[in-house]
């Protein structure tokens, strides 16, 4: 048989790398039902607790009554409705950029932006730990592709010396598996000095960072001249779905003309855009959500330190517990689930071999008591894992 899929699947099972889809049988929130089991979840990207907010739900209902269900066509045919346009205007205002362009998913936004901006004869340089969609965009662009050392401006500068054609430097804002933040001011300086453009995917920073929720760039005070291409997602802190690119008038017009993932797909349901508008309003107005989330992050890190857990250098909602071996990470995840807690084990190839981890994600919807329940369970389960290895 030409395609021996059974052997590939068996090999993945044997390496403790087999993935399965848990079945969510409740709305998003800290308290969920998964595969029939009530659980306290610490693995959602609903950072501000907006995915099940009653005002956002009502906005979707009202949007469906006014605009119907489907987008009907691509944006360039007859699928670009008033709610879509209003979301783009709100996103441009939130991020302090001239214009925004709405995409159906973050993956499509990253592929669309990179492949529209660089091609054969050009160069794309990426952080080694970038999200898969960024790496795929670089590979598919046809440009000369290279990765610099993680969050290392000197490594980037060295690779820029060999760059040809138009050069795009691409980085995550908040790295999704480590939770650390890119040194954007230094990366922007290096890129600008060599005539390159910096593109930042701030999927995990938007909404959670910055005084107004504008993300990591707002926190650093960086403008469109520092970061010409900014990507954000709407399915995380915003609680809905979709993604966007913000930047100059010329950038957005270029993407409308050349970004194939934008051109050749049906637009999102207009009702979804109505829900997103309400979520963006809450994201900006409810500053207590960011303040509460920051307090939970401090609580978790201090508690984890007392237990003796190995954490990554993260002060964001993503708090990975480094385990190392994939089998041990799975074992700890199972022990927590037996105690009613859902924390996902992240294994290769998502992370490098030998760096499997439990990826704890915190939300403004969590309470201090719920975070303490997680810490108590970790204090009980982690020593059991260590003693089993002894």
UniProtKB/Swiss-Prot annotation:
* One Pfam family of this chain: Aminotran_1_2
What does the record note on quaternary structure?
Homodimer.
Its pathway?
A: Cofactor biosynthesis; biotin biosynthesis
HAMAP family in alphabetical order: BioF_aminotrans_2 (MF_01693)
Q: Which UniProt keywords apply?
A: Biotin biosynthesis, Pyridoxal phosphate, Transferase
* Protein name, as recorded: 8-amino-7-oxononanoate synthase
Q: Name one GO molecular function term.
A: pyridoxal phosphate binding
- Name the chemical reaction catalysed here: 6-carboxyhexanoyl-[ACP] + L-alanine + H(+) = (8S)-8-amino-7-oxononanoate + holo-[ACP] + CO2
Its needed co-factors are:
pyridoxal 5'-phosphate
What is the scientific name of the source organism? Answer: Pseudomonas entomophila (strain L48)
Q: What is its EC number?
A: 2.3.1.47
The record's NCBIfam families line, in alphabetical order, gives: bioF
Span of the secretion signal?
Answer: none
Query: Known InterPro entries for this protein?
Result: Aminotransferase_I/II_large, AON_synthase_class-II, AONS_Archaea/Proteobacteria, AONS_Proteobacteria, PyrdxlP-dep_Trfase, PyrdxlP-dep_Trfase_major, PyrdxlP-dep_Trfase_small
